[in-house]
Amino acid sequence: MQDEERYMTLNVQSKKRSSAQTSQLTFKDYSVTLHWYKILLGISGTVNGILTLTLISLILLVSQGVLLKCQKGSCSNATQYEDTGDLKVNNGTRRNISNKDLCASRSADQTVLCQSEWLKYQGKCYWFSNEMKSWSDSYVYCLERKSHLLIIHDQLEMAFIQKNLRQLNYVWIGLNFTSLKMTWTWVDGSPIDSKIFFIKGPAKENSCAAIKESKIFSETCSSVFKWICQY
């Protein structure tokens, strides 16, 4: 009888030790798992932080690159007296017109919706005048409306312009002969591509460009024609 009681007592004690050891192992496993979870969580947070900083840096670099390109490129702070040679812009006031507005219009979002009465083509907006002005007055008119006289980049754009012109007379574009550079220059400061366009007429001081039937002609800048604004 005593042996039986001793056996039962030993059996109970053995079970208690086994249960305690199991509890200790389970708690230890949980502690290890929690430790690794904290490590992984820390690594994840660090990686996310690095990615966020990298993205912010890229955005800042792109923004600075666009700004520097705009500042150092054709959109300089030179006055329009330099770009238009000896032309007097807006006679009487002899106002100096900065090219900052041209720079702003070129860096604008290409997906912007065109204003009322403006036509959209290839991410740009076009306005066709019904009045007639000299080249310099036409230039000022466009600039005051946060745009510039038409700059034509290729024959497809020329075809679009001709399709929407409802008359066959001359129309001013943003191209003139500058005495300082002694060349035909667009209002954004870039030279004309002679491989794409040929200008009929003299290349001399006080000469501005007008289009008629898909051709570009040299005309006296004081002549009065209709014009096209673009942004």
UniProtKB/Swiss-Prot annotation:
Could you tell me what this protein is called?
A: Killer cell lectin-like receptor subfamily F member 1
- Provide a GO biological process annotation: innate immune response
Compartments where located: Membrane
Q: Which cysteines are joined by disulfide bonds?
A: C142-C229, C208-C221
How does it get modified after it is made? Phosphorylated on Tyr-7; this phosphorylation is required for NKp80/KLRF1-mediated cytotoxicity.
Major subcellular site:
membrane
A GO cellular component annotated for this chain's UniProt record is: membrane
Organism of this sequence = Homo sapiens
> What are the protein's GO molecular function terms?
carbohydrate binding; MHC class I receptor activity; transmembrane signaling receptor activity
